[in-house]
């Protein structure tokens, strides 16, 4: 998946490390969906 922005990464998207991963079929085990972005796309961040 592609990198995505997690709430824990900081207040803004620019200049911060993107620690999330964008998955197209939900999130893998040990991750959680940190943004509500539809039922099939998961903005997944480590728990």
Curated annotation (Swiss-Prot):
Similarity comment text for this entry: Belongs to the sea anemone sodium channel inhibitory toxin family. Type I subfamily.
Keywords, alphabetical: Cardiotoxin, Disulfide bond, Ion channel impairing toxin, Nematocyst, Neurotoxin, Secreted, Toxin, Voltage-gated sodium channel impairing toxin
The keyword Transferase appears for this protein: no
Name this protein carries in UniProt: Delta-actitoxin-Axm1d
Coiled-coil regions, chain positions: none
Organism, as annotated: Anthopleura xanthogrammica (Giant green sea anemone)
Major subcellular location class: secreted
GO BP terms in the entry: regulation of signal transduction
């Amino acid at each position: 998946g592609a990198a995505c922005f997690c709430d824990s990464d900081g207040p803004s998207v620019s200049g911060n490390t993107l620690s999330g991963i964008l998955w197209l079929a939900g999130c893998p085990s040990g991750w959680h969906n940190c943004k509500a972005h539809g039922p099939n796309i998961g903005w997944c961040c480590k728990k």
